[in-house]
């Protein structure tokens, strides 16, 4: 039987965590220093500290996020939405935060949309990033619209800001940061958000020893109010 990632981390003294660095405020790469900052980074820094090991953030992107766990490029990932597709290949920790999805556009186009159904029309361009949960969602939700798929590091919202697309869908988490950062971004008015989704860390599917360790740590930190503190710090 292969040894657990837990043994490897403790013997080598390094916890390797895959992160994309493009999900504000969860994980953001500071191009000036090449360091990562954000909610995830604070969580992982604490996990490494509690384990008594060093933290190494390993750059990845959304389309290879799961593959990196499977291949052993890192011991776990930062926050990722739980999805049936990812569950086929990787394990997850317990969830510690949840998101829900909203559509966004720009101030010059916000008058064109009223609710989810108004987006699902011929002539509407919906932008999304390859390999994200959002890509699957928009293809399912808007079969009549034109889906514009871009590859990271490009992002769906950038296509909308540049005028090459009309709408992007993202979580309340990223949406709030984009509304703050870009004055011309507007949330499309909808009756209810869609796809409320728990967020968790991706882990090697068959490594139950490591999964158990991470889950027990999450429960401990939840009880101590740690996740609430970090969420408050990052405005979540």
Describe the residue ranges of each PLM region.
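Short helix-initiation/N-cap motifs at beta->coil->alpha
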Residues: 41-42, 56-67, 114, 148-162, ...
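A structural signal for short loop-to-beta-strand junctions that line the ligand-binding cleft
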Residues: 6, 36-40, 87-99, 187-191, ...
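Periplasmic-binding protein-like
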Residues: 98-105, 176-219, 236
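Alpha-to-beta junction loops
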Residues: 15-16, 51-54, 70-79, 124-125, ...
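A ligand-binding cleft/hinge motif common to bilobed small-molecule-binding domains
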Residues: 63-67, 80-89, 137-140, 161-162, ...
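Flexible hinge/capping segments at coil-to-helix
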Residues: 107-125
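Extracytoplasmic small-molecule ligand-binding "clamshell" domains
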Residues: 2-80, 88
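Ligand-binding clefts/hinges and TM-proximal coupling segments of bilobed small-molecule sensing domains
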Residues: 4, 133-148, 189-190, 218-236
